[in-house]
Amino acid sequence: YDVMLIMREIQPFDTLDFCNILSITKEQFEKRGIPCELADVLNFASDKASAYGRRIYIWSTVRAKKVFAGAYRVGRVISSARLKSPVYFANALYADKLCSYITENGYDTVVMPHLFPAEAMTWLQRQHKLEVQTYFIATDYTCIPFTEETKVDYYFIPHEELATEFIKRGIPAEKLVPTGIPVSERFLQLPGKREARVQLGIPVDKSCILMMTGSMGYGRVENMTAKLVEQTGEDTHLYILGGTNEELKKTLRDRYADTERVHVLDFTTEAHLYMAAADILFTKPGGLTSTEAVAAKVALVHTKPIPGCEDRNVAFFTQHGMSVSGDTEDAVIQKGLKLLRDPEAQAEMRKCQEKYGKPYAADAVCEFICGQKEAAEAAQKKA
């Protein structure tokens, strides 16, 4: 059977959580000999929609955080399992084109980590236009607005403790599967800290702070860097993964050109090695990055989130001892430096990450989907 993995691509491929999660899931299916295709759902709406959506997303998260936060709150208020939102009807507009593509290419399973394709597939199934198995992967540690107005066969959620929230929002309990959020196998096969540092050329006799800014360099990275440099000594090196934000990287490189312990790096495919090498990690609380950090078992400090679902990510991680954070930038830095200087606290955090993390989620997702397919085929033969 064939699997179609549908995302909403709003950043360059390999830099967005949705894209990464589907790439990871695709690898697991292909290991089992199951062909897959990745698709950007808005390509079915128009050729320009994906690029436009990407620009709007970047503007809303970098330039208009308050607007984004307000929209998220409004979404929670108007979202309902019974009444359909404008989001639902907007995604219904291209659903027929999506339906034709799925039918013509013979796909019988659709996997989605984003609301938009889930809304479109819901419309198709309500109109009885398409008979395929559908699966939604939640990519944050909360039930995001409008999830409850979707109707798919199963919802893969990050943790069983979140089931109550999804049920309260209207998702049937029997449709919830607490697999975790899929992460790459690279995070499951990490070298030790010393070996990772040797591979990356990081001093083995210094403290190492890793800062991940996100693919767009979101957040007040310049201020945080200045404060971390000011409050640490020559025995502490700071490695900044600058993502695709060229302006940010140039600013930092110019400012710290004469500071040998500040290293500003371009987009890298070796984030897993940097996590393995680091003593502590400062990162924005995205669902995938946070899950990767737990899989890597690195002491985790969450910076100020994008308003909305990332606030819920911080709450889940801090309540379970898997990260520390603060209400202000200064509080975040102070908690991070305290963690850096406390090996026992780091060890305790790793124990919590071991207890609550689900590093084998990608395998669990694929195994569940394959199991459902096999069960359906067996039932059909009996009939």
Predicted region positions:
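Conserved N-terminal ligand/cofactor-binding loop architecture of enzyme catalytic domains
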Residues: S23-Y101
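A nucleotide-sugar donor-handling region in carbohydrate enzymes
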Residues: D153-S215, N245-E247
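Donor-nucleotide binding loops and adjacent catalytic segments primarily
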Residues: K193-E195, I202-A278
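Acidic donor-binding loop of glycosyltransferase active sites
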Residues: A276-G286
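A short alpha->beta transition loop at the rim of the catalytic pocket in nucleotide-sugar-dependent
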Residues: A278-D279, K297-A299
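C-terminal "capping" alpha-helix adjacent to the active site of nucleotide-linked donor transferases
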Residues: T318-V324, T328-E344
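A short, well-ordered alpha-helix in the C-terminal region of glycosyltransferases
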Residues: A345-P359
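C-terminal alpha-helical cap of glycosyltransferases
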Residues: K358-A383
